[in-house]
Amino acid sequence: MAKYLESKDSEFNQEVLYRTGENYKGEQTYTPRLVICDLKGSLGTLRHESELYEPTEGSRQAHAWTGKMELFESDPIKKNQYLQSLDTPDGEFKLSYAGDLSKNVKVWSDFNSLYYHPTTVYELTTHTHDDENNRFLLPTRGREVYQELAMDETLMDVRIRQFMEESDNPQGFQIFANSFDGFSGVAAATLEYLAEDYPKKARIVYGIAQPKSTSLSKEQTLVQNINQALTLKCMSEESTLYIPMRAPSVLKYGHGVWQSNLRKHENMYEWSGYLAAAIETATSPFRLTNAFRLDMADLSGLLNPHAFNSTTALAFGLPLSLPQSRDTSLASIFKADEKMNRFESAWDLTLETPYDQIDRTSHCSFSVFRGIASILQHQYPSLNGLQPYSITQVTEELTNFTKRYGPMLAQRLVFLSVVGPTFPQFFGPMVTTTGLIRPTSPKDTDQIGQSEKMLTPEPVTQCASYARLHSGSALKPLFEFAVASLKVSSLNNWVYTDYTHGQFGLDRSDFESSRETLQELCDAYGESVDYDDSFSDDN
């Protein structure tokens, strides 16, 4: 990590997200400016105390106590291939551990390689990971847990305030939270605290939803829809930007150009990796070292200029369809459907469409094109001897794209998306290890001297990506669906009764009030665009 942070070639300032410190041995450390809240039992092999900073509590007691000791310990959690490789740094390190991780990941720490500050990890001790008898399902329960654990003090004052006080002019906060379960309630309470204590700092929230699945029961689907509607209402009011996100659904993988370059996401390890890549690409301008760096507050002002409704959509394409041969023109790569204004090399993670619907009339749009020129340097020359596209040529074509489908503020990044050894290998067989797309016809294959073995999957180590944040009337269907989700009727009243319990319980009037607020936000959008019923329950 230290070697990466000290890189002179990176266009990113890693200290925006990482802090320097010193451990108990006097050695310099790099740890993320991060607080993680998770359930008891979700840490896996991750220790509560980090030996990066101090000896473990058991080690300190062993040195301090001279009397008889009786030791009780549980069986150690077996480490997967990747974590074992970290324990043997001199051993062989594979390009990808995704195959093993995809089968064996149980918690996020199974693919963690970072050291954390002692105040980073915060366990919600009221609930246990994978406890079917005490599930953390409702936002009302999340707010109760926030109060029961006195998180105003134990989380906000002790942990977050410490990171803020040691930071030099922090841009703001990024909050990542499930929008479909109890964590949405914890996030809502946290956001309200931040809005009160740091009103001038940007607060960008990412609401993570599970991919739609036919395996969910009717009750589970109703509960998730209600939770997401309540989260949308709260986050739209308290955040400077709220970005609801859902990974591409297997039910829609048959649509869109992008899907030919990806396999279906099989599990949470894979689909969460896709969402993480989208967020990392879209927010990369926050960390630039040059004059083109974009502050979090500036982005919030661009996408939510009147501070009326912070909800924003995120479209993402990874990998971009950059051909292995130079024979394909750049103009054809970045060509959207002229009639429908759709860029089909991306998936809208908010509107759940297998394309990016571009509104040429809206100024509330920000795009990031990442690593395109770097990836194209690996192209084969054309039959006419043309060499790979230069950075200047790529810049000109991207400028033309933003003019054709603008007004659009865009950022071009040279630094490509590096596919690390723990990142899911959900790429299709036509994607090369350098992130280019192999030709599909036998004629094209023969021209560049390839053979049948080219279809053998190989780890993808880098790729180009595209992300676009946008707001405006395109988001109206999102609010229409939320309004419908909060409509109490005789058919679904049995589900709503679960929300009435506890100190933060909601009755029928509370739901009606939230529904009215969402309806007002919905009406403010005016006429909406037809999005093929993206939000219907049967999709």
Model-derived segments and spans:
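Terminal, contiguous helix-loop blocks that mediate binding/assembly
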Residues: 1-539
